[in-house]
Amino acid sequence: MKKQSEVKRVSVNLTKRVRALFMGAALVLCLTTANYAAAQAGPPTVFLGSAGTFAVLAYAGVTNAGPTVVTGDLGTYPILSCTGLPTPCTGNGPGQVNGTINAGDVVAQHAQASLLIAYNDAKGRTTNPIGVAGDLGGRTLAPGLYKSTSTIGITGDLTLDGNGDPNAVFIFQIGSALNVATHGRIVLIGGAKAANVFWQVGSSATLGTYSAFKGTIMAYASITIATGATLDGRALAQNAAVTLDTNAVTKPY
């Protein structure tokens, strides 16, 4: 009887250990799956507040040359300068705005305040940053937070792959300037959307001639969109002007 009791006790203990091992393995699998899913989706989005309705927003005015088409609101605050666009801007064209023009009013003021918050949010992200430097042309990047301490260039195509997730977020922290070369492109694949791509630029951003860019640019200084370039996103300048020249700027949805 004593031997049977010992055998039974050993069997019970073994069963408990096996069960504990299975539970531990299941927990590790769940955590790994959750972490993988989070990595696939990238960081949380950047909330733009009232700046989100704007395709173009400047601090020191908006200047346009040529038949630019802006789809979304356009604003400037506190400097009211606005040329080459419809009234209330001076020149009454040749640019076109399919949205509301807010020149120096309280709406533009509130949008600038929201931009400051969004800019600082994007700049302050610190979770799992991926270091990048130099020219990003020719690369394919997954959702994530990308950090550069200096200037970033894009020559050729930079591909952003959403990995099948339409909510995948890409945030780029750029310590200095963003320079997109002539005919440089952002290519979105795998469900990636322009509305979920954010560029926090520590100085000025320049989109080269006939480039095709995607995402919301939040620049500390100026934004220049050269002749024939397109932007599926937003040009939001925190402390300087936005310059346009025969462009298509479309606020993403």
Task: Place the predicted regions along the sequence by residue.
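Bacterial N-terminal signal peptides that target proteins for export
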Residues: 4-25
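C-terminal segment of classical bacterial N-terminal signal peptides
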Residues: 19, 23, 28-38
